[in-house]
Amino acid sequence: SVTGVQTCALPISHPTLDVTFFIMFSTLAAHVCYSLFMEGKMFRALVISTVIVAIAVSAVEQLLRIIGKWVSHRFLNDDRHGDPLSKVYALKKFVDQGWQLVYHCSFSLWEYLLLRKYNWFAGSVIWFSSEETVEAPYAIRLLFIAQISLWFFQAYRHVFVNQRKKDYYELFLHHIVTLSLCYYAQYGNYKLGLIILFLHDNSDIFIDLLKMLNLMKIDGPKDFFIIEIEYVVSLLVWIYERLYTLPITFMRDGIMVMLDHYKGLPMASIFRKEWVFCIEIGCLWILYGLHIYWFILLVRLGYRAFVSEPENIRNISKEGYEGDSDVESDDESPKKNEIGRASCRERV
């Protein structure tokens, strides 16, 4: 602040939500592990995948740390950019977002290749009733297992490692419903699940790039309006893939096909037969609600940054893209920021 006194605008903590979401995720994770263990075939893959994820993320983050420092010092060390990634927290956030970019690019490619291999872009039926015996191809089950291990890892870091941001609870809810969708999709409606995974991972690539460009302070005419163009592209991709294609996919190719399959049965009977699928559709509606919420935030951010307050674009972008609390500073060390947050908690 101007007076030098640190403001204490920490994200509000809700103990009831903390306990509820933690129990929900832990129970679901235990159920997933137990079910895979009892099945036997994929449990070993889950364990190996979780170990690989932990090692790979650590290696990717170390590489991104080196690359980020070098790029910032070599190409952005001027008066306008100010070597942005030389600051401790800016580099940390760049690395955190960078491994997300690597993850989303890798899995988008993996999912795309599987979709092409099995020709699921051709409009074939992608919903199966619970009465049908459907065995998902091993390659697809392996993909879902790898996704599950990543959601285990992300949830652990979200709760126990990362600093809480303003959308902490929204992201926690997102982790819960995504884990549920990944687990149940691998058994029955893996075709629908794979398409939905692809839509999510592919659209996240553009958001990752947007956040990383913002951390590097690449904006304006001298940087060829790169971040401004990326912002527009991110909005368009989000609208098409998450707000348009996603609901059409699970409504037209999921719900409507199910209702047609059980034509003449009352809804209560359909629910008894397909209660798992109905719950997963509920999870998809939760995801869709989160997509609308984040889209509104993204539009508001763009309006403030480019229309109403363009002179404060970097502060607005920092708050919006990165979700910082007011006690976090890019210029301070992690230890100083932790002290600042602790002093705020003592005064709350």
Region roles according to the model:
Residues 211, 242, 345-347:
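Basic side chains
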Residues 293:
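Catalytic cores of secreted or luminal carbohydrate-active enzymes
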Residues 195:
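Classical protein tyrosine phosphatase
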Residues 9-191, 214-239, 244-286, 296-341:
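Membrane-helix and juxtamembrane interface regions of eukaryotic multi-pass membrane proteins
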Residues 199-210:
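Alpha-helical transmembrane segments and their membrane-interface exit regions
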Residues 2-10, 345-347:
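Short, small-residue-biased leader/transition segments that mark boundaries at the very start
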